[in-house]
């Protein structure tokens, strides 16, 4: 029984030594690997391509709001950062010039030190990440092909022309549709159809009025009576 316990203790001790040895080996590899060190130092700043980004010196408002932001966040833990910034901006505007002056002096001192330390410094704002375009928003190839295949042809959309004026108007519309973009084809075709319908209706009304004015009134002939027999 004691031999079993001693063997179990020996196995546990061996496993513990192996774990400690692995931990030391991993830590040595992490410290001696330059890639790992570079990744730790430049984590979150991969856009600079390994160059240490120089921060701008803080202005008077940033110096004042540094402590005030922490105070407001502790007093209002549910408040978002954007709301805290709005509140701090309002409080900064309410301060007098005498209250702001110490922060302006400190900001000027920091700018002078920054200018001496980085004489060739130029402010380069970071580029905003462009949102990726969704493929669902782009027009599909089938819809583009369908728009290109839309034609204004008499075989597809036959029209009945009443006069030469309607024919010329439709010819001009065909030229305009052929030179315009495919998106406007449907609306132009609908306008042309409405124009032709109104023209045809107006022509038919004028023709009917002309016929009623030119033709004499027609009365049905009465049955022959004595007056018709003696007075033809």
UniProtKB/Swiss-Prot annotation:
<comment type="function">
    <text>Transcriptional regulator that controls a genetic switch in male development. It is necessary and sufficient for initiating male sex determination by directing the development of supporting cell precursors (pre-Sertoli cells) as Sertoli rather than granulosa cells. Involved in different aspects of gene regulation including promoter activation or repression. Binds to the DNA consensus sequence 5'-[AT]AACAA[AT]-3'. SRY HMG box recognizes DNA by partial intercalation in the minor groove and promotes DNA bending. Also involved in pre-mRNA splicing.</text>
</comment>
<keyword id="KW-0010">Activator</keyword>
<dbReference type="GO" id="GO:0007548">
    <property type="term" value="P:sex differentiation"/>
</dbReference>
<feature type="DNA-binding region" description="HMG box">
    <location>
        <begin position="54"/>
        <end position="122"/>
    </location>
</feature>
<dbReference type="GO" id="GO:0005737">
    <property type="term" value="C:cytoplasm"/>
</dbReference>
<keyword id="KW-0804">Transcription</keyword>
<keyword id="KW-0539">Nucleus</keyword>
<dbReference type="GO" id="GO:0005516">
    <property type="term" value="F:calmodulin binding"/>
</dbReference>
<keyword id="KW-0221">Differentiation</keyword>
<dbReference type="GO" id="GO:0030238">
    <property type="term" value="P:male sex determination"/>
</dbReference>
<dbReference type="GO" id="GO:0005634">
    <property type="term" value="C:nucleus"/>
</dbReference>
<dbReference type="GO" id="GO:0030154">
    <property type="term" value="P:cell differentiation"/>
</dbReference>
<dbReference type="GO" id="GO:0016607">
    <property type="term" value="C:nuclear speck"/>
</dbReference>
<keyword id="KW-0678">Repressor</keyword>
<keyword id="KW-0963">Cytoplasm</keyword>
<dbReference type="Pfam" id="PF00505">
    <property type="entry name" value="HMG_box"/>
</dbReference>
<comment type="subunit">
    <text>Interacts with CALM, EP300, HDAC3, KPNB1, ZNF208 isoform KRAB-O, PARP1, SLC9A3R2 and WT1. The interaction with EP300 modulates its DNA-binding activity. The interaction with KPNB1 is sensitive to dissociation by Ran in the GTP-bound form. Interaction with PARP1 impaired its DNA-binding activity.</text>
</comment>
<keyword id="KW-0112">Calmodulin-binding</keyword>
<dbReference type="InterPro" id="IPR050140">
    <property type="entry name" value="SRY-related_HMG-box_TF-like"/>
</dbReference>
<feature type="compositionally biased region" description="Polar residues">
    <location>
        <begin position="176"/>
        <end position="189"/>
    </location>
</feature>
<keyword id="KW-0726">Sexual differentiation</keyword>
<dbReference type="GO" id="GO:0001228">
    <property type="term" value="F:DNA-binding transcription activator activity, RNA polymerase II-specific"/>
</dbReference>
<dbReference type="InterPro" id="IPR036910">
    <property type="entry name" value="HMG_box_dom_sf"/>
</dbReference>
<feature type="region of interest" description="Disordered">
    <location>
        <begin position="117"/>
        <end position="141"/>
    </location>
</feature>
<keyword id="KW-0238">DNA-binding</keyword>
<comment type="similarity">
    <text>Belongs to the SRY family.</text>
</comment>
<protein>
    <recommendedName>
        <fullName>Sex-determining region Y protein</fullName>
    </recommendedName>
</protein>
<dbReference type="InterPro" id="IPR009071">
    <property type="entry name" value="HMG_box_dom"/>
</dbReference>
<dbReference type="InterPro" id="IPR017253">
    <property type="entry name" value="SRY"/>
</dbReference>
<keyword id="KW-0805">Transcription regulation</keyword>
<dbReference type="GO" id="GO:0000978">
    <property type="term" value="F:RNA polymerase II cis-regulatory region sequence-specific DNA binding"/>
</dbReference>
<feature type="region of interest" description="Disordered">
    <location>
        <begin position="170"/>
        <end position="189"/>
    </location>
</feature>
């Amino acid at each position: 029984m004691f031999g079993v316990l001693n063997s179990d203790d020996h196995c546990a001790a061996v496993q513990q030594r192996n774990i400690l040895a692995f931990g030391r080996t991993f830590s040595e590899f992490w410290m001696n690997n330059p890639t790992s060190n570079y990744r730790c130092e430049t984590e979150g700043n991969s856009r600079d391509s390994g160059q240490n980004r120089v921060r701008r010196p803080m202005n008077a408002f940033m110096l004042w709001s540094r402590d005030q932001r922490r105070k407001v966040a502790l007093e209002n833990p549910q408040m978002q950062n954007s709301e805290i910034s709005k509140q701090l901006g309002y409080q900064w505007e309410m301060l007098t010039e005498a209250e702001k002056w110490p922060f302006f002096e400190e900001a000027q001192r920091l700018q002078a030190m920054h200018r001496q330390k980085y004489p060739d410094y130029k402010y380069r704002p970071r580029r905003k990440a462009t949102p990726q375009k969704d493929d669902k928003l782009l027009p599909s190839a089938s819809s583009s092909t369908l728009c290109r295949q839309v034609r204004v042809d008499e075989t597809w959309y036959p029209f009945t022309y009443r006069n030469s004026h309607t024919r010329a108007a439709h010819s001009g519309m065909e030229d305009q549709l052929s030179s315009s973009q495919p998106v406007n084809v449907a609306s132009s075709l609908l306008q042309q159809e409405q124009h032709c319908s109104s023209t045809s209706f107006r022509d038919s009304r004028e023709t009917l009025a002309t016929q009623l004015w030119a033709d004499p009134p027609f009365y049905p002939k009465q049955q022959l009576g004595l007056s018709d027999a003696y007075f033809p």
